[in-house]
């Protein structure tokens, strides 16, 4: 059951109220989530997880939901949340106090911030509550040492780069004032005193040097993983200057798309589109000038019914139809699997695993597999490569009109070839940006003179892609 919250609607003016205008009624009520859980139990689910991808479920809300789930379901209930906005540790303790069967945690060096709370902290709470954990904490301590090294190795992908201070609950003694915070948190959870609970839990996290609550994530209402993914990708695209604008646009884009829950893949679709919209604004273009193919499919209805209906006028603007249109499986076409003649005539996807990778993540897999085949070929043909000479040709000046990249990304697919006649607004190329596919159209009618890029290559915003003769 994907936990999410209603967006913050703009405050209505007195004139709007007098005209009878109202903001939409709440969608994501306790009953909404319970009904979803009951539906899945009826379908044969063995367990229900309340999955809070954004870390936005506060302790008071889980204190309402957990007894409701436990009294209406016959199967175990699990709780999954993140610490990004500062609720995670307090919410997990609240869930434990109110009867949860299972909670999701992370091991110390990978815990806190955009991740789940540390199992070591939950272990201390459970010991104080007289709850036995079916976990070998000695093994956890050994694993944690290995994870420290692994996280160091992954530093390039670490959006936080803040390690908690070393701690082992089996061998280290807590200072009396910190131990008192644990007792205060338990008392606050039992009495449903959310303010005191959060104060105690955040003091515990601060003592161990876990990341502080991220206010930007709290306001934008996004999952921690979605946030770190967006940061990492914007860094790769040298576009970190639009991060704050993109984050602020997420609630707006999500509402326009029918309030989908921000969980994979819809979290990435909405996040990438918010980036597109921020780039549009930066380039003085209307929002939604550039939309990913996946966002079009979401708005069209191909990912299924959204919690609230999409405005037909918006659907027409984005997807070219006013009607919700489910995905037609009979029209599915597998990804092309070309022979790479330049790398020894091997196929791009050589086995079932690679074919599946192409089908699931075409925008990423194509570039990944091409580089893999190239590296393998170069490793076995070093002598031949050394003997080859390179014929350097003088670059021909551009005389026609040019289709440019509206954003940084990778060339996923070129849809035209030299000599093709194209019309204004025709799709000429697919650009992969933030793992989403974006159709790039020609602003001109004419004949394709030259393709200025290659599939699989990275381009910057404003890069020249295709030359068109008018």
Predicted regions and their residues:
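Short, proline-centered helix/strand-breaking motifs
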Residues: 76, 358-363, 412, 439
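Catalytic alpha/beta core domains of metabolic enzymes, predominantly
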Residues: 53-284
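Alpha/beta enzyme core
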Residues: 1-75, 93-100
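Terminal or standalone catalytic/regulatory effector modules within metabolic enzymes
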Residues: 187-398, 406
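Short acidic loop-to-helix transition motifs that present clustered carboxylates
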Residues: 4-5, 31, 84-88, 410, ...
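Structural motif
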Residues: 51-53, 78-82, 106, 406, ...
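Structured functional modules or segments
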Residues: 396-470
